[in-house]
Amino acid sequence: MTNKMDISNYEIKNKGLHLVKATKENFWPLMDLRVTKEQENFVAANSVSLAQAYDTRADGKFVQPFGIFDGETPVGFAMIGHHSYEYEGMPEVDKHSYSLWRFMIDYRYQKRGYGRDAMKLLYDYIITFPDGKEDLWSTSYVEGNDIAAKMYRDLGFEPNGEKDGDEIVLVLKL
């Protein structure tokens, strides 16, 4: 876990890209975003993610869903959690880290650098420690999702040896 995302060397390529907190006023376009048919087994639908966010907040726990926008156009969705859920067999790291709970770029906007750029924006958000200080940012990916695995590793995430069901857990030191 010695790698750290080097934000000083990472420059966002899509200058209009920004995060917008998901609200009741803007969630409909986020629910319309889709991945490719081949990617559907790798990430839950945004409608499921937004329902989970609503339920998590109703329980008084921290979760922040975001629309990823290029200008006025929604191109992706992400959701950050922190001590947001507990279940039997959950990775230990999720008990003491910020978690990238969901991340997707719509199939129409993939292969344009939005994924890496959005991860940089999410990193900048997380290091403000909106729900308290942590040393780690965790995420996971379904085995076989080589695109996600490569992106996360290129950004400094490393496997920590844990699994979350069929997902490989990765961490980034903050």
Name what the model sees in each region.
Residues 1-11:
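Acyl-donor-binding surface of acyltransferase catalytic domains
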Residues 12-17, 21-108, 125-129, 161-164:
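Acetyl-CoA-dependent GNAT
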Residues 19, 111, 141:
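Conserved SAM-binding loop
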Residues 99, 104, 138-140, 169:
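Conserved beta-strand segments that form the floor/walls of ligand-binding pockets within enzyme
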Residues 105, 111-125, 150, 154:
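Conserved acetyl-CoA-binding loop-helix of GNAT-fold acetyltransferases
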Residues 116, 142-161:
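Conserved active-site alpha-helix within GNAT-family acetyltransferase domains
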Residues 133-149, 165-167:
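Conserved beta-strand-loop-alpha-helix junction that forms the acyl-donor binding cleft
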Residues 171-174:
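Short beta-strand-to-coil "C-cap" segments at the C-terminal boundary of structured domains/repeats
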